[in-house]
Amino acid sequence: MPKIFEYFGFIFLFYSNEHEPIHVHVMKDGHEAIFEIILENGELVEIHRRNSNKIPPLIEEDAATAEAFVKKYYKNIVDKWVNFFIYKKRIRSTKITKKI
């Protein structure tokens, strides 16, 4: 379960046993949301948010912040997803300290 980003209390991560579509799990304060990144010709078309079946959902304000983060950093998330799931590379977590 590699952590890919930390952002003001949010943890962005992948579960290592998952598959397409490209998505990222976001956790904060014991809550979680999952953001699917929909691309067309390498460009962002849509971000689809869904809730976990096992963990309570992020509160709406946190979900909106997490979605804004995913929108801003989607290329980095996709690169890390491809490196981890396709190329089986080890990925490093990045701590973001500048508010978006």
Spans of features found by a protein language model:
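Negatively charged, low-complexity tracts enriched in Asp/Glu with abundant Ser/Thr
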Residues: 1-12
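Generic preference for hydrophobic/aromatic residues in regular secondary structure cores
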Residues: 4, 43-50, 73, 77
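Generic structural motif recognizing short loop/turn segments at the entrances and edges of beta-strands
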Residues: 8-10, 31-33, 41-43, 74, ...
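Short linear sequence elements within intrinsically disordered, low-complexity coil regions
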Residues: 10-12, 17-20, 40, 79, ...
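Extended aliphatic helical segments
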Residues: 11, 24-26, 38, 45, ...
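A short, structured beta-strand/loop element
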Residues: 16, 20-61
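C-terminal structural segments of small proteins and small subunits
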Residues: 64-96
